[in-house]
């Protein structure tokens, strides 16, 4: 019995020595039961408070200007409105969307008449409230909310992008073209560089 106890103690000692060696020379990742998970850094965007009136103005502009465009095209129109705020076109989306001016213009009879010019054509056309259940308006509203609440799609066009037009027309704008998305071509506020005349 005594011999068995001595043998047991020897075996136990050897086992502990070997276990200690393994634990001190083996990376801890192989012993999951000793590990504590490494903290994962998670970026959580907090939604900004959105004014329903401003949301409606931006959503209507997206809907009327780009309702049939791809999501990026609609988002680009929304970003143009926000870019204009930072460039002094207005202090909020509604100011920018409904910005207009009245000018004197000569009609076909040679008479001067007052003409209202709008930043966005649908405003001058007097279009009213869209059908809130229209799937395209629902999508436009979601894009508008994401842009206002989370600053979403902030890389779809540069922050200098302030203008756009339908790609089927070709106005003589002096601005640099940024990109075309769907049926809209977007421009920055930077003037086109004049071509150097190298003829001698």
Task: Tell where the protein language model's regions lie, with residue ranges.
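Bacterial extracytoplasmic/cell-wall-associated proteins, especially those involved in peptidoglycan
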Residues: 22-200
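Short, Lys/Arg-rich N-terminal segment immediately upstream of the first membrane anchor
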Residues: 1-8
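Hydrophobic membrane-insertion alpha-helices, especially the h-region
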Residues: 9-26
């Amino acid at each position: 019995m005594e011999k068995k106890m001595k043998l047991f103690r020897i075996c136990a000692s050897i086992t502990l020595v070997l276990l200690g060696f393994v634990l001190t020379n083996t990376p801890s990742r192989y012993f999951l039961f000793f590990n504590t998970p490494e903290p994962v850094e998670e970026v959580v965007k907090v939604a900004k408070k959105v004014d329903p009136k401003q949301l409606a103005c931006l959503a209507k502009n997206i809907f009327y200007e780009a309702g049939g465009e791809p999501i990026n095209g609609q988002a680009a129109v929304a970003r143009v409105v926000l870019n204009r705020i930072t460039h002094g076109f207005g202090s909020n989306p509604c100011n920018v969307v409904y910005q207009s001016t009245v000018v004197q213009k000569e009609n076909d009879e040679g008479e001067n008449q007052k003409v209202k010019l709008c930043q966005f054509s649908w405003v001058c056309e007097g279009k009213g409230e869209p059908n809130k259940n229209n799937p395209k308006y629902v999508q436009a509203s979601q894009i508008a909310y994401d842009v206002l609440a989370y600053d979403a799609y902030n890389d779809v066009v540069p922050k200098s992008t302030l203008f756009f037009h339908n790609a089927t027309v070709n106005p003589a704008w002096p601005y640099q073209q940024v990109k075309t998305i769907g049926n809209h071509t977007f421009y920055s506020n930077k003037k086109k560089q004049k071509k150097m005349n190298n003829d001698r």
